[in-house]
Amino acid sequence: MGQLTKKFGKIDVSLPIPHLLNLQVDSYVKFLQEGATERRHDEGLEGVFRSVFPIEDFNRTASLEFVSYEVGEPKYDQPECISKGLTYEAPIRIKVRLVVYDVDEDSGNRTIRDIKEQEIYFGTLPLMTEKGTFIINGTERVIVNQLQRSPGIIFEHDSGKTHSSRKVLYSCRIIPMRGSWLDFDFDHKDILYVRIDRRRKMPATILFKAMGMSKTDILDYFYKKEFYRLDPMGRLMWEVQKDMYRKDSAFVDIEDGKGGTIVKAGKPITKRAWRLISEAGLETIEVAPDTIEGMFLAEDIVNPATGEVLAEAADEITASLVENLREAGISRLPVLHTKGLETSSSLRDTLVLDKTPDMEAAQVEIYRRLRPSSPPTPEIAASFFDNLFRSADYYDLSPVGRYKLNQRLGIDQSVDLRTLTDDDILRAIRVLLHLKDSHGPADDIDHLGNRRVRPVGELVENQYRIGLVRMERAIKERMSLQEVSTLMPHDLINPKPVAAVLKEFFGTSQLSQFMDQTNALSEVTHKRRLSALGPGGLTRERAGFEVRDVHTSHYGRICPIETPEGPNIGLIVSLTTYAKVNDFGFIETPYRIIREGALTDDIKFLDASREQGEVVAQANAAVDADGKLADEYVTARVRGDVLMSHRDEVTLMDISPSQMVSISAALIPFLEHDDANRALMGSNMQRQAVPLLRSEKPIVGTGMEGDVARDSGACILAEGPGIVRYADATRIIVSYENGLYPDRGGVRAYDLQKYHKSNQNSCFGQRPTCHPGQIVKKGDVLADGPGIEDGELALGKNLVVAFMPWCGYNFEDSILISERVVKEDVFTSIHIEEFEVVARDTKLGPEEITRDIPNVGEDMLRNLDGSGIIRIGASVKPDDILVGKITPKGETQLTPEEKLLRAIFGDKARDVKNTSLKVPPGIEGTIIDVKVFNRRSGEKDERTRNIEDYETARIDKKEQDHVRALGDALRDRLADTLVGKQIAVTLPGKRKGEVLAEAGAPMTRELLDALPVKRLAGLFKSREVDEMVDTALEDYDRQVAFLKGIYDSKREKVTEGDDLPPGVIKMVKVHIAVKRKLNVGDKMAGRHGNKGVVSCILPEEDMPFFADGRPVDIVLNPLGVPSRMNIGQIMETHLGWGAKELGRQLAEMLDSGAAMATLRHEVKDVFRSATIAKLVDEMDDETFRKAVSKLRTGIVTKTPVFDGASEEDIWSWIERAGMDGDGKTVLYDGRTGDKFYNRVTTGVMYILKLHHLVDEKIHARSTGPYSLVTQQPLGGKAQFGGQRLGEMEVWALEAYGASYLLQEFLTVKSDDVTGRVKMYEKIVKGDNFLEAGLPESFNVLVKELMSLGLNVTLHQEEGKKRPKRVGFMSAL
C-alpha cells in the first residue's frame, strides 16, 4: 500500500508520458537491427554496408559484394567492463562474396568466372546499455543528439544588409545530406547567380544549359508568351489570350462588335472589362505602337525567305528592330510577358550575361570553375556534371531532404529518390523568382520545421560510413595490385579504418560526453539533451542571438527554460516531456483532435511544419460535461501567434499543460509563479543535487517524480506479472508468469548495485522495496536507486524554513542552518574515490607490490595485509599507505664505506625507492572495495586468491538461490494439479522413523513445499500425473543446466586473470567511501533557483522556535525573494506547511485512539477527492492505520506545473491546519527566549545539497610543485598549487606600505629559486631573516628580450648599499 497523496491537478491527462529514454534506445535499435538478417530494412548499419558495397576494381574484373552481417555476443558484461576499464562491445561478422569476371576484349561483356563467399570478422561495435549509455574504456558515456539544419531547400533574404542600396536580395540554397551544396542568389542588379559548393559564382543559366536546355527552353519555362501582330499600316495589334490580363489603358476605343463600347480610349482596362472582351470574342486589340519597346523577344526571329536570324531570343525590342522586322515581312512577334506584371526580366538579363552557347560549353565552364587546376575535355566535364547531383554515389539528398523538397516545392516524388532532378532545380528557381518579384517572406531557418535531430544511431551510422569509404579505397588498390583470382575475401578486407573512426568518435567527439551521473535526473536529462554544436553544427562563437532564442515552433517540442547559463545558452536545449522524434528527425508533440468544437479521444503527433495552419487550444481551456469547449471564444495558437478563436475554428488541443517544458522544469512546483531566469537556475541545479544517505521525497511535488525515477534506469522494475521469490540487500529473484525467460523457467535474478562509484564520485546504491512472496505486476518498483524513495525522485529533504534576517548570517543569500540537520545526518552524503596503482616492468627491473617497504615504520603498515594491500574496512586519512609499492632505483655512486658494507652483507636488494600509493590530502574515509588485476600467466598473491575464493563463494550462493527459486516456481505451477492427488509410496522424513506421508495419502501444499523437486518423480498413483511431472522435471533439469552454464562461465572469469596493457605486471584499484557531512561553505538550493552557501551551523537551542518549542531547521533571507521574482518558493513553503501540519494532526488522531469511522471521515474531508474517498472505503482497518501513520511527516501533494494548487487551495489547507491565513507565525529567539517583533513566514521547503562541496574545493599548500619555466607555484587543487597574488593584490599591499611582506610574496614565496633554498636553510637554523634574490620571472623577461634580438646585461650600481636585513617579527 503506497502513501495517500493529494493531487491538485484539475486537467485529466489521457496520454501517458512516452518513455524518457526512447529517443536514445530506439535510435540505436533501429541502427543495429539485431533481428533476422532477411527482414532488415535498408537503413542503419545495413544501409551503410549496402551503400558502399559492391566494391569493384578499376578494370571491373572483380566485384566484392555484401551479403549480410551478424552481431555477436559481448565478451564481458556491463559490470565487468566498468570494473576492468573495458569497452562494452560486440563482435561484428560480415558475409561477403567475391565475384571474379572474364571480360570479352571485343564486346566488353562480362561473364562470371568464380564466386567465393566467406564470413569475416569485421571488428567490434560498442553496444548501448538498456539505460541508453555506452561504456567506453570503463566509463559510461552519452552520445548527445545533435540539432542541425535539415537537408532540403531554404529560401532566404539578407534584409537589405548586404548592398549599400539597402535592396533586399533573395537567395535559395539546396542542402543535401551528402554532396555538393547548391546556392542561387541575386545581386543588386537582379542578375541570378549560382554557386556550387560555395565556389565562385556564375550566371544561373549556365547550370540550365548544362542540364540540356536551350535559350528558348529556358525562356519558355519561366515566362509566358504574348503575341503582337505588325500591321502593314504601322498599327500594333495585341492578340487576346484568355489567361493573360493586361494591366493597361486602352489605346483606342474597344468595341464589342455590336456597336457598343467596352472601354473608351485612355481609360484603364479593368477585370470586368477584360471579361467582356473575352465574351465578345475579340481576337486582337490595337495598342500603342511603342508598347513593345523595351520588351524582349521570346524566340529567335528567322527570315522565312533566307533563313537568316534577324533577332535572337531575349533580345530587347527597339523601334528600329520593329521597323526592320516589318520590312523583312515578319508579321507576328512572340514577346516575353514581363512588363508591368509580377514576373520581372531578371532571368532574361541573366541569360544575356551568359556567353556559353550550348550544353557542352556550359558543362566545361562548370568543370573549369570547380576544378580550376585540371584541363577539361567535354567527356570529363559531362561525367563530372552528371556526378554532381544525379549520381547516388556522390549525392544523397536523404529521405528527409526529399521530403522537405517535396513539401516546399509542391512536388510528388517518392522519398526514395535521393538525388536532385532537373525539375527540382527549375521549380526552386521559379519559387525564388516569385518570392523576389512579390517581395514574399523568407523561410525561417530557426523554425523547427527547418531543423532536425540527428540521434545517436544516425551519428554512428555516418561515422561507420566514413570508415567504410576509407576501407573501400584500400580494397580497390589491393584488387588492382594483386591477382584477384587467387585471393579470398579476407585478403582484401581490413576493418582497421572502421575501428579507428569508431574509436575516435566514441572517445573524443564533441557529442560523445562523459555522462553526468550526479543523480537519476541528471542522467535522464543528459540523454534527452539536444546540442546545436559539434561536427556539422554551429560553433558557440559564430552562433547569433536568433538561433539561441526561444521560437514559437519550440512549443511542446523544446523546453524554453532548461538551457545552460554560460556561452552555450540556447545552443544546448532539452526535449519537452511529451516530445518524440519522428523517422525524418523532426520533433513532434501530441495534440487531441477537436471536431466541431468537441473533444475526441484521438491523439496525433505533429511536427512543426504540419502544425502550421492548425488552430490549437490550450490544455486548460474549459470543457463542459459533453466534452465540448465551454466558451464560445478560446485562447488558441495559430502560426505561432496567440489569438482568441471561435470554438468551431479550433482543430487541436494541447494534451497537458506540462507538455511545453522539460522534465527538469516540470519537477518545479508552482513554476508558473517563478521568473524564467530563476526557473532556468532551478531546473539546472536539481541536476547537481547529491543523493543523500537517506532519501526523502518532497511533500510538495508535481507528479513527475515517479516518471523520472522509473525511466532513469536507476530503479529495478518488474518486467511482467510475477512473484518475488527471494529478496535481500544484494539480490532480488522474481519468477514471471507471462512467458518471459523461458530458458530459465521464467526466473530472473537482479543483482543490486552497492556502493558503486558514479562518474561524479557520488555513491550509487540500490535498496530493495519488495519482500519474498510479494505479487508484482509490470512496472512495479522492486528496488530504489540513489536519490529515489518508493519509486519517486527524492533529491533533497523537507525542512522547516523561516524567512527572516538573523544577525547578518543570511546576508547575500547565505544560509543559516540548525545543528540538528548535521547531527541527524539529514544532509550527509557518501562519495566514493577510486585510486589506482600499477606495477610495471621497468628497465631497471620489475616494480613490486609488497608490504616490505624500506624506511617505513610498522605503524604506517598496520592496515596492510601480507601482500601490501590495505584491508577492506580500514579507516584511512591523508598520507596513509593504501598499496605498498617499491621501484628499482638506478645505480648510484657509492662511497667506499657503502661498498664495504655491500661486499660484507650483500645488501644489493635494498636499492629501491618507495613509490607506494598514498591517500591524497582532503580524503578521509573507509576502504570499501579492493580489486587486484593480475596477468593471465602471472603468479597470484595471497590477496588475489582470497578475493577469488570470496567471489567464487558468492557466485555459488547466487546459483543456489537461483535454483531454489526455480524449484519454488515449478512447485507453484504444479500445485493446482498435484494437491489432492494420491501418493504411491510412503515418504520418510529426515529423522529416523519419521514419516512425512503414508502411501495412498493425498498430496498437500505443505508436503509439496517440504519435498525436494527431484523427489516428485514417480511419486503418484496416476500415470498421467507422473508423466506430466516427468515432463516438467525434464524442463527443470534443462533450465538448471542452462543456469549452471551461466554461473560456471562467471566462476571461470573470476579465476582466469586479466588482459593488462603491455609492460603492466599487476594493477590494484582501491575504493574509499568518504562521508561528507553538511559543512559551512557547502552550496544548497531550493527548486526555484534560490541558491545559497551555508554560513553558519547554529546549535539547535539557538535557532528561532515556535510557541510549542519546535525549532526551525533553516533560516533564509526574505530579501532574496522580491527582486528574484521566484514567488513559487513562498507558495511551496505555505502548501508544505499546511501538508505537514494536517498530516501530523491526522497521525496524532490515530495515536490518541480516535474511532476509525471518525478518522476515515477526517481523511476524506482533508483530501476532498473521489478517488481517495473510494480508496479509504476499500481499505481494511490495518491497512488504513498504516496509510495514516505514513502521513506523520506530512501529506504528499502533487501540484503539476500550470495546473497546480490555487491560492484558495493553499489558504484553505493552512486555515484547516489551524494557522493564520497569511502563512506567518510568531517565532521566538532561541538565544533569549524573546518573541520576535514581527510575525515570520514559515513553512516547509524542499532543500537540495548540491555537489559543490567545500571539502572538495578547499586545500592548503606549504611547498609543492613549481612551473618549469617561470619557477612559480602551480595553480589549482589538482596540481597541489598555490594561491595567485595578482596585480590588484599587489596594489593593496602597496597602499598599506607593506614592503617587506610584498618582497616576501614576490620573491621567496614565488619564483626566487636561490632565495627559497636559503630560506629553508635559515628556518632550519632558526635564523629568521629574509634574503631575497632575483625572481626567475625576471630571467624569463630577459630571455624574451634576447629572443627579440636585444642583449640585456645587469650591472651593480656603484656606491649602492644593500638594504639592511630585517627580521620577520620586526617587519610586522
From Swiss-Prot:
Quaternary state and interactors: The RNAP catalytic core consists of 2 alpha, 1 beta, 1 beta' and 1 omega subunit. When a sigma factor is associated with the core the holoenzyme is formed, which can initiate transcription.
Pfam families, alphabetized: RNA_pol_Rpb2_1 (PF04563), RNA_pol_Rpb2_2 (PF04561), RNA_pol_Rpb2_3 (PF04565), RNA_pol_Rpb2_45 (PF10385), RNA_pol_Rpb2_6 (PF00562), RNA_pol_Rpb2_7 (PF04560)
BP GO annotations: DNA-templated transcription
Protein keywords: DNA-directed RNA polymerase, Nucleotidyltransferase, Transcription, Transferase
Enzyme class: transferase
Protein name (Swiss-Prot/TrEMBL): DNA-directed RNA polymerase subunit beta
Superkingdom as given in the UniProt entry: Bacteria
Protein's organism: Nitratidesulfovibrio vulgaris (strain DP4) (Desulfovibrio vulgaris)
E.C. code: 2.7.7.6
Cellular component terms (Gene Ontology): DNA-directed RNA polymerase complex
InterPro entries: DNA-dir_RNA_pol_bsu_external_1, DNA-dir_RNA_pol_su2, DNA-dir_RNAP_su2_dom, DNA-dir_RNAP_su2_hyb_sf, RNA_pol_bsu_bac, RNA_pol_bsu_CS, RNA_pol_bsu_protrusion, RNA_pol_Rpb2_2
Family: Belongs to the RNA polymerase beta chain family.
Keyword Nucleotidyltransferase: yes
Protein function: DNA-dependent RNA polymerase catalyzes the transcription of DNA into RNA using the four ribonucleoside triphosphates as substrates.
Catalytic reaction equation(s): RNA(n) + a ribonucleoside 5'-triphosphate = RNA(n+1) + diphosphate
Recorded GO MF terms: DNA binding; DNA-directed RNA polymerase activity; ribonucleoside binding
